[in-house]
Amino acid sequence: MRILLTNDDGIHARGIQALIGELGSIAELFVAAPDRERSGTGHSITVFDPIKVIKAKLAGIKAGWVIGGTPVDCVKLASSKLVGDNIDLVVSGINHGPNLGTDVLYSGTVSAAVEGVIMGSPSIAVSLNSFAADTDFSFAARFTRQVIQNLFKNGMEKKTLLNINIPYLCPQDIKGIRITRLGVRNYENLFEERHDPRGNTYFWMGGGVLEEPQEEDSDVNAVQHSYISITPIHFDLTDYHLVEQYRKSFSQFSHLLGEADDNF
């Protein structure tokens, strides 16, 4: 089995190092991860600057690269050039902090996994619900190994994309596993205005998560109630139940485009 590891916390982050230590016994590991913290970069790619690549010297891996780009750059470059398209699984994480609900749209961790699927490899994103500096990733890494072994034992489609969030609790205090859907995460969205020595204005974004009621089957609710959340997701954002409605409502505009198109 050939696994590509990546993240958005940087190649030296403790989460990805824990995965290297845990997965080396079950797979041939390749690592392509950012050269620094790249959290919150979403699905951005680097198109107007060169992407610098340096070989990484890490124990327990087949090959590794420090990438001067985003998490999506890492997966795209590894799949296209560095490793090739014979990657059996992309694992993104373990993220230092959760990636729940609508936050997946901002998440570099989840976006890297999405890119893995786009490039033809099944993928999982793993996040641990802790921001503490002394966070212990060992249980999350062990759980990830068990998930991977189960997926390959039972078969895994190339379009598989799982977003896993693990509560930061002692294993015996975790109540179980829930297969969930994405919830909603809203923030205070505070912007602190400051001025540099030359008088130019800049802002620091801040504000915490708003504690709001969540649907019982959501990932947010699961982690709040001490369950591991596993959410199957995909990158097709089409709102299918509105497609037919808007086909009808916009058909009246066809005459503005010339001959009417019955397939509008």
Curated annotation (Swiss-Prot):
UniProt entry keywords in alphabetical sequence: Cytoplasm, Hydrolase, Metal-binding, Nucleotide-binding
Binding site for a divalent metal cation: 8-9, 39, 95
Keyword Hydrolase annotated: yes
Family classification: Belongs to the SurE nucleotidase family.
Reported function: Nucleotidase that shows phosphatase activity on nucleoside 5'-monophosphates.
HAMAP family, A to Z: SurE (MF_00060)
Name listed for the protein in its UniProt record: 5'-nucleotidase SurE
Species the sequence originates in: Syntrophomonas wolfei subsp. wolfei (strain DSM 2245B / Goettingen)
